[in-house]
Curated annotation (Swiss-Prot):
It comes from Rickettsia bellii (strain RML369-C). It is found in: Cytoplasm. Belongs to the TRAFAC class translation factor GTPase superfamily. Classic translation factor GTPase family. IF-2 subfamily. It comes from the Bacteria. It holds the Pfam family IF-2. Its main location: cytoplasm. This is Translation initiation factor IF-2.
Length: 828
């Protein structure tokens, strides 16, 4: 009996109501390894709570594992029921959101920190108790395994137990780690007390798993992931970029370096391609467009060919119909010299300009704007009438809307009048004929009209389309009719222009003024020119610094048909050049350089080429053609151009006129230096030399001539050229002699006894010996005697003795003609 009772399994009981430890034990010590433990067994009981908040709060209130005096079977039943509830609850929470993970993790950490690990010493003699407990433990393990083996989805989240690192699903799971130790009792070393760590993202990754087999694998840290991403990024940067094929613009000539940059290719690659074509070039050398196109095409790039002249393609958009506004007509006044053109303008604008002009003739173009009583405006351009200003008249006709041809009633049609008519017809503009000076007595207006018929200018009264208006500029007769005619024609033409956009127009005149630099008179034809705009006019460019109108008042902008004077250009442009507003100064500079290059090439191409004979004559100093070098300086470009054109038209078969330099502005020291080096004459038209230039001219003995009227200048230059011409040698017959007898005198030679049959014979005169009407000899008379005495001359009807220089082949019956050589000054 007793043995049977002893062999029965006994219930596990505790001496106290609470399970306690004699020594303190940190909860984190459970993670330590128990390799050194030999005589003691550490048991840690931790609970992981999940599910309803009621259960969690209940466990939190308890705060520790309660071990009462209940029996082991009650404890087993309690744990079993808790595990079953956890399994049921986990099924309900399979689709719970991952957002609750952070809350559960923090709760589990707080619970783990509150539970105390339990250290129990078990006696080796408790084998019987183990046998009793084994069936129950096996049953508990089966339930735990069934709970853990529930189907797992991707969204299943596992929580890592803080005790030994195993992961459990949401639910309650308790594990006991029992290590049998040897008899020698060794207590694990007490760990350092550490503060509870703050929850980090790495803890979140540690608590999340996708596979049961990854229970013991560690999750990659954020630093590792970051390093991997940086490595991938570096690899992508190291990879060669994809080649970009471009469309490049090729000029006629391009440098190899610029060509490579345009294609974004290495210069070495371009040079290799050129070497394949048999061209050896470095980065600084240039290649033609055809070669560049071959290389670019081979490298896969598209090519767009452009001409060098494309730099002048200044974009001007077409004006919209709604932007067009009515503008004032531009009227050009033409006619012969002194027919009253400027006086007519004086009467129209009530100013006295003619009195300030030398010789009563207009030396350069003037542009004026006249506002009538009704508010309408007319822009007048006055052109010179002298024949030297033909180019200026042609420019005036090219920019005008209406041409007024002034004809003096007492003088009629003159050469410049005909030229003005031809210019107007060539420009295809309406013509108004103003017969001026009708206030003079003894005039015949009908005679002037009949002369106009010869040039196809037919008045309206004769059935034509030309308005002929008799006026008097001095007495202001019929000026109102002239203005009405201008406005009527302008209204019929429907003159309009857009005041919007970039300005463009034409240069009327240009000059250099001391202290102000280059001054240019312009007529705006389109858009609005503003102060500060960058313009290009011919080869001159620059920013508009200041604008003044025809009355000398500074303005900030100029609209179409408004003449203005600007300053700010690099140099004076040519009259008649078109001006345009560009966006940048670089664009203006490129255009100006291209135009200068073209003008230089054109000048070289039209220069007369010297023959080989001329070069030899020039080298030997025996050139037959003489040369007159000139330097021309004037006040305005139009006058300088007119003077140069007139001088070059002079005959130059024997004297060649060479204009070394022509410019606008006063005579400078550089002009004097150039004249001294080339033995030239300086001609100043309405300009003077500065003090330094005068001193230099006196020192270098350079001739400077000043003029204010173009007639005087042309006449003087003609006289200088005429003086350089070789004189004309003319032969003048003075008499005839008949040889009647030949005398041989010792030491003298043959003497011809002669008789003067006609005229007179002089000693030293030229003689021509004729035999049978054939000239045998031509020379000079060496000896003239009468009765053994030397005489200067012998008249008709007298006898004399004559002898020739270096010639004695004379016979009786020969005839001698006597003549004189007369030099006459040659004129151009």
């Amino acid at each position: 009996m007793t043995d049977n009772q002893e062999n029965k399994p006994k219930k596990l009981t505790l001496s106290n109501t609470k399970l306690s430890l004699n020594k303190s034990f940190d909860s984190l010590a459970s993670t330590q390894s128990f390799v050194n433990a030999k005589s003691k067994t550490l048991v840690e009981v931790r609970k992981s709570y999940s599910g309803s908040t009621t259960t969690l709060s209940l466990n939190k209130e308890k705060g520790s594992l309660e071990t009462g005096s209940s029996s082991g079977s009650e404890e087993f039943n309690r744990r079993l029921s808790i595990l079953k509830k956890a399994a049921e609850q986990s099924k309900l929470n399979d689709n719970s959101q991952i957002s609750t993970l952070s809350k559960l993790a923090s709760i589990n950490q707080s619970i783990a920190s509150q539970e105390d690990p339990i250290e129990v010493e078990q006696e080796e003699s408790s084998d019987t108790n183990k046998v009793k407990e084994e069936p129950k433990i096996e049953e508990v393990k089966d339930i735990e395994e069934s709970t853990l083996q529930t189907p797992k989805k991707k969204e299943d989240i596992f929580v890592k137990s803080p005790l030994v690192g195993t992961r459990t699903r949401y639910g309650i799971e308790s594990e006991k780690t029992v290590d049998k130790v040897t008899e020698n009792k060794v207590i694990a070393p007490k760990p350092k007390v550490e503060e509870s760590r703050k929850f980090k993202k790495t803890d979140l990754f540690n608590m999340v798993g996708d596979d049961e087999n990854d229970n013991r694998n560690r999750t990659r840290s954020l630093a590792s992931i970051k390093r991997a991403r940086e490595k991938e990024k570096r690899k992508s940067l190291v990879q060669a970029p994809e080649k970009v094929y471009r469309e490049i613009t090729l000029p006629e000539v391009i440098g190899v370096g610029d060509f490579a940059n345009a294609m974004s290719e290495r210069v070495s690659d371009v040079i290799k391609e050129l070497m394949k074509l048999g061209i050896l070039a470095n980065a600084s050398q240039t290649i033609d467009a055809d070669t560049a196109e071959l290389v670019a095409t081979h490298l896969g790039h598209a090519v767009k060919r452009v001409q060098e002249s494309d730099v002048e393609n200044i974009l001007i958009t077409n004006d919209k119909e709604e932007d067009l506004r009515s503008r004032a007509p531009v009227v050009t006044v033409m006619g012969h010299v002194d027919h009253g053109k400027t006086s007519l303008l004086d009467a129209l604008k009530s100013t006295d300009v003619a009195s300030g002009e030398t010789g009563g003739i207009t030396q350069h173009i003037g542009a004026y704007r006249v506002t009538l009583a009704d508010g309408r405006a007319i822009t007048f351009i006055d052109t010179p009438g002298h024949e030297a200003f033909s180019e200026m008249r042609s420019r005036g006709a090219g920019v005008t809307d209406i041409v007024i041809i002034v004809v003096a009633a007492d003088d009629g049609i003159k050469p410049q009048t005909v030229e003005a008519i031809n210019h107007a017809k060539a420009a295809n503009v309406p013509i108004i004929v103003a017969i001026n000076k009708i206030d003079k007595p003894d005039i015949d207006i009908e005679r002037v009209k009949n002369e106009l018929y010869m040039y196809e200018i037919i008045g309206e009264e004769a059935g034509g389309d030309v308005m002929v208006i008799p006026i008097s500029a001095l007495k202001k007769i019929n000026l109102d009719k002239l203005e009405e005619a201008i406005l009527l024609i302008a209204e019929m033409q429907n003159l309009k222009a857009s005041p919007f956009g970039s300005a463009s127009g034409v240069v009327i005149e240009s000059k250099i003024e001391k202290g102000r630099g280059a001054l240019t008179t312009m007529l705006v034809q389109r858009g609005t020119l503003k102060s500060g705009d960058i313009i290009i006019a011919g080869t001159a460019y620059g920013k508009v610094k200041k604008m003044t109108n025809d009355k000398g008042i500074e303005v900030l902008e100029a609209t179409p048909s408004v003449p203005i004077e600007i300053q700010g250009l690099s140099h004076v442009p040519h009259a008649g050049d078109m001006f345009n507003v560009v966006q940048t100064e670089k664009q203006a500079k490129d255009i100006a350089e291209y135009r200068e290059r073209v003008a230089k090439e054109k000048k070289i191409s039209i220069a007369p080429r010297s023959s080989l004979e001329d070069l030899f004559l020039k080298a030997s100093g025996s050139s037959k053609i003489k040369e007159l070098p000139l330097i021309i300086k004037g006040d305005v470009h139009g006058s300088v151009e007119a003077i140069a054109g007139s001088l070059l038209k002079l005959p130059n078969d024997e004297v060649k006129l060479r204009i070394l330099h022509s410019g606008v502005g006063p005579i400078t020291e550089s002009d004097v230096s150039l004249a001294h080096a080339s033995s030239a004459i300086i001609v100043g038209f309405n300009v003077r030399a500065g003090a330094n230039a005068k001193t230099a001219a006196e020192k270098e003995k350079v001739e400077i001539r000043y003029y204010s009227i173009i007639y005087d200048l042309l006449d003087d230059v003609k006289a200088i050229m005429s003086g350089m011409l070789d004189p004309i040698i003319r032969e003048q017959y003075i008499g005839s002699v008949e040889i009647r007898q030949i005398f041989n005198i010792t030491k003298i030679g043959k003497i011809a006894g002669s008789y003067v049959t006609r005229g007179i014979i002089k000693k030293g005169a030229g003689v021509r010996l004729l035999r049978d009407n054939i000239v045998i000899h031509e020379g000079k008379l060496k000896t003239l005697k009468r009765f053994k005495e030397e005489v200067k001359e012998v008249r008709e009807g007298y006898e004399c003795g004559i002898a020739f220089e270096n010639y004695e082949d004379i016979r009786e019956g020969d005839t001698v003609e006597v003549f004189e050589l007369i030099q006459e000054k040659k004129q151009l």
